[in-house]
Protein backbone atom coordinates (compact mmCIF):
# COMPACT_ATOMS: atom_id res chain seq x y z
CA UNK A 1 0.00 0.00 0.00
CA UNK A 2 1.35 3.41 -0.92
CA UNK A 3 1.59 6.44 1.33
CA UNK A 4 -1.03 8.19 -0.80
CA UNK A 5 -3.56 5.44 -0.05
CA UNK A 6 -3.33 5.87 3.71
CA UNK A 7 -3.27 9.70 3.84
CA UNK A 8 -6.45 11.72 3.97
CA UNK A 9 -6.71 13.96 0.89
CA UNK A 10 -8.17 17.17 2.34
CA UNK A 11 -6.54 17.10 5.80
CA UNK A 12 -3.20 15.55 4.68
CA UNK A 13 -3.10 13.39 7.79
CA UNK A 14 -2.80 9.64 8.26
CA UNK A 15 -4.41 9.95 11.68
CA UNK A 16 -7.56 11.48 10.18
CA UNK A 17 -7.74 8.65 7.64
CA UNK A 18 -7.38 6.06 10.42
CA UNK A 19 -10.16 7.79 12.37
CA UNK A 20 -12.38 7.69 9.27
CA UNK A 21 -11.73 3.95 8.98
CA UNK A 22 -12.70 3.45 12.64
CA UNK A 23 -15.92 5.46 12.23
CA UNK A 24 -16.74 3.57 9.00
CA UNK A 25 -19.78 1.28 9.14
CA UNK A 26 -21.27 -0.90 6.39
CA UNK A 27 -18.89 0.45 3.75
CA UNK A 28 -20.27 4.00 3.85
CA UNK A 29 -16.95 5.80 3.71
CA UNK A 30 -18.34 9.11 2.47
CA UNK A 31 -20.65 9.25 5.50
CA UNK A 32 -17.77 8.39 7.85
CA UNK A 33 -15.63 11.07 6.19
CA UNK A 34 -18.42 13.65 6.59
CA UNK A 35 -18.84 12.77 10.30
CA UNK A 36 -15.10 13.11 11.00
CA UNK A 37 -14.74 16.38 9.06
CA UNK A 38 -17.74 17.89 10.82
CA UNK A 39 -16.38 16.82 14.23
CA UNK A 40 -12.98 18.38 13.47
CA UNK A 41 -14.69 21.54 12.20
CA UNK A 42 -16.70 21.80 15.44
CA UNK A 43 -13.50 21.46 17.47
CA UNK A 44 -11.87 24.24 15.43
CA UNK A 45 -14.89 26.51 15.98
CA UNK A 46 -14.93 25.75 19.69
CA UNK A 47 -11.34 26.68 20.52
CA UNK A 48 -9.69 28.31 17.47
CA UNK A 49 -7.14 25.50 17.29
CA UNK A 50 -6.65 23.04 14.45
CA UNK A 51 -8.93 20.01 14.75
CA UNK A 52 -6.14 17.74 13.52
CA UNK A 53 -3.80 19.04 16.25
CA UNK A 54 -6.51 18.45 18.85
CA UNK A 55 -7.01 14.90 17.48
CA UNK A 56 -3.26 14.23 17.72
CA UNK A 57 -3.27 15.54 21.28
CA UNK A 58 -6.27 13.34 22.16
CA UNK A 59 -4.67 10.22 20.67
CA UNK A 60 -1.40 10.83 22.52
CA UNK A 61 -3.37 11.21 25.78
CA UNK A 62 -5.46 8.04 25.22
CA UNK A 63 -2.75 5.81 23.71
CA UNK A 64 -1.92 3.00 26.17
CA UNK A 65 1.71 2.22 26.96
CA UNK A 66 1.06 -1.27 28.38
CA UNK A 67 -1.74 -3.81 28.14
CA UNK A 68 -2.39 -7.30 29.47
CA UNK A 69 -2.46 -10.49 27.40
CA UNK A 70 -3.83 -13.81 28.61
CA UNK A 71 -1.08 -16.42 28.85
CA UNK A 72 -1.68 -20.05 29.76
CA UNK A 73 1.01 -21.60 31.95
CA UNK A 74 0.59 -25.04 33.49
CA UNK A 75 -3.20 -25.09 33.49
CA UNK A 76 -3.55 -21.58 34.89
CA UNK A 77 -4.26 -18.47 32.84
CA UNK A 78 -2.33 -15.34 33.80
CA UNK A 79 -2.88 -11.78 32.66
CA UNK A 80 0.66 -10.88 31.57
CA UNK A 81 1.48 -7.17 31.09
CA UNK A 82 3.14 -6.29 27.78
CA UNK A 83 4.30 -3.08 26.13
CA UNK A 84 2.10 -1.81 23.32
CA UNK A 85 3.64 -1.14 19.92
CA UNK A 86 3.06 2.43 18.62
CA UNK A 87 0.73 1.46 15.76
CA UNK A 88 -1.33 -0.79 18.03
CA UNK A 89 -1.49 1.97 20.62
CA UNK A 90 -2.80 4.46 18.07
CA UNK A 91 -5.40 1.97 16.84
CA UNK A 92 -6.53 1.23 20.40
CA UNK A 93 -6.77 4.95 21.15
CA UNK A 94 -8.89 5.63 18.05
CA UNK A 95 -11.08 2.58 18.72
CA UNK A 96 -11.73 3.73 22.30
CA UNK A 97 -12.43 7.33 21.25
CA UNK A 98 -15.01 6.17 18.68
CA UNK A 99 -16.56 3.62 21.07
CA UNK A 100 -17.03 6.10 23.90
CA UNK A 101 -18.28 8.75 21.46
CA UNK A 102 -20.99 6.29 20.35
CA UNK A 103 -21.93 5.61 23.96
CA UNK A 104 -22.54 9.32 24.69
CA UNK A 105 -26.07 10.65 24.73
CA UNK A 106 -26.98 12.99 21.93
CA UNK A 107 -28.25 13.02 18.41
CA UNK A 108 -25.40 13.57 15.98
CA UNK A 109 -22.35 11.30 15.85
CA UNK A 110 -20.25 14.28 14.74
CA UNK A 111 -21.18 16.22 17.90
CA UNK A 112 -20.51 13.20 20.12
CA UNK A 113 -17.17 12.50 18.39
CA UNK A 114 -16.11 16.14 18.71
CA UNK A 115 -16.98 16.09 22.43
CA UNK A 116 -15.04 12.86 23.03
CA UNK A 117 -11.96 14.14 21.16
CA UNK A 118 -12.16 17.40 23.14
CA UNK A 119 -12.46 15.52 26.46
CA UNK A 120 -9.65 13.11 25.57
CA UNK A 121 -7.33 15.98 24.63
CA UNK A 122 -8.03 17.56 28.02
CA UNK A 123 -7.54 14.34 30.02
CA UNK A 124 -11.16 13.40 30.73
CA UNK A 125 -13.80 11.22 29.09
CA UNK A 126 -14.47 7.52 28.67
CA UNK A 127 -11.44 6.80 26.50
CA UNK A 128 -9.09 8.19 29.17
CA UNK A 129 -10.82 6.07 31.83
CA UNK A 130 -10.32 2.99 29.63
CA UNK A 131 -6.59 3.76 29.29
CA UNK A 132 -6.26 4.22 33.05
CA UNK A 133 -8.13 0.95 33.65
CA UNK A 134 -5.78 -0.86 31.23
CA UNK A 135 -2.75 0.57 33.01
CA UNK A 136 -4.17 -0.42 36.42
CA UNK A 137 -4.66 -4.01 35.19
CA UNK A 138 -1.06 -4.12 33.95
CA UNK A 139 0.20 -2.70 37.26
CA UNK A 140 -1.84 -5.20 39.28
CA UNK A 141 -0.45 -8.11 37.26
CA UNK A 142 3.15 -6.90 37.18
CA UNK A 143 4.17 -9.99 39.16
CA UNK A 144 3.43 -12.15 36.09
CA UNK A 145 5.63 -10.10 33.72
CA UNK A 146 8.27 -12.85 33.69
CA UNK A 147 5.82 -15.16 31.79
CA UNK A 148 6.34 -13.20 28.55
Curated annotation (Swiss-Prot):
Coarse class of the primary localization is plastid
The GO terms describing molecular function are:
rRNA binding; structural constituent of ribosome
Fetch the SUPFAM superfamilies from UniProt: Ribosomal protein S7 (SSF47973)
Tell me the compartments it is located in.
Plastid, Chloroplast
Q: Name one GO cellular component term.
A: chloroplast
Recite the UniProt keywords alphabetically.
Answer: Chloroplast, Plastid, Ribonucleoprotein, Ribosomal protein, RNA-binding, rRNA-binding
GO biological process per UniProt: translation
Claim: Cell wall biogenesis/degradation is one of the keywords in the record: no
Q: Name one Pfam family in it.
A: Ribosomal_S7
InterPro entries according to UniProt: Ribosomal_uS7, Ribosomal_uS7_bac/org-type, Ribosomal_uS7_CS, Ribosomal_uS7_dom, Ribosomal_uS7_dom_sf
Top-level taxon: Eukaryota
Q: What does this protein do?
A: One of the primary rRNA binding proteins, it binds directly to 16S rRNA where it nucleates assembly of the head domain of the 30S subunit.
- Give the family per the record: Belongs to the universal ribosomal protein uS7 family.
Complex formation: Part of the 30S ribosomal subunit.
Q: What is this protein called?
A: Small ribosomal subunit protein uS7c
UniProt source species:
Cyanidioschyzon merolae (strain NIES-3377 / 10D) (Unicellular red alga)
